[in-house]
Amino acid sequence: MKKVKIVYNPNSGERSIVNKLDCIIETYQSYGYILIPYRLNKQNPIKDAFIDLNEDYDHILISGGDGTVDMVLNVMKELEINKPIGILPTGTANDFANALSLPFNVKESIENIINSSPKKIDIGKVNNKYFINVASAGMFTDVSQKINTEFKNSMGRVSYYIKGIEEALHLRGFNIRVHSDEVIYIGDMYLMLVFNGKTA
């Protein structure tokens, strides 16, 4: 039987994944897959999720929001793991899943992953960090990191807007140097965004 590694963030999106695990396992089993879970938390390094990875694994299923997807992507690149990923959008915002028009129904999402073939997508790199959705610097860019998890889980997307308004009260520019193959920019700005999707 083929294996699938699911790396999931139990705190994403009002902890919605916790109530969906049985449906995820049941759906994969009905297609002849063995699902091997890895629960993300502060105590377990994310690299440990891939200790047992071998050719028996068909793909990596990432369950969480944009931050979880970025974390797993960076570890996979660091460890030179070249396996297809499936995204189960169970986070608060899920901007990248929205950009790809991925289904949010768990069963539909899994069946979509199983019944489709892998497709290549671009990923970006800033300094030594990869990103799949957006790279940002300046005002509002650390809003999601500053939000209390319980507040975010209870308020959902609204929590980002509330924190953003709070941050706007301390608006100030910063000096930046951007160097790419096409352009070099040195100057002041309030916010810089590099999109791989449609929103951030």
Regions found by a protein language model. Name each.
Residues 12, 69, 92:
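Short, glycine/acidic-enriched loop or turn micro-motifs at the edges of active sites
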Residues 198-200:
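Short, intrinsically disordered, charge-balanced linker/junction segments flanking boundaries
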Residues 64-65, 136:
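Helix N-cap/beta->alpha junction signal
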Residues 1-63, 74, 108, 183:
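ATP/NTP phosphate-donor binding region
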Residues 7, 31, 38-40, 78-194:
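Catalytic core of DAGKc-family lipid kinases
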Residues 68-80:
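Short Gly/Thr/Asp-enriched flexible loops that form oxyanion-binding sites at enzyme active sites
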Residues 15, 72, 95-97:
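Generic hydrophobic alpha-helical membrane-span motif
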Residues 62, 70, 194:
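Redox-cofactor binding/interface segments in oxidoreductases and associated redox assembly factors
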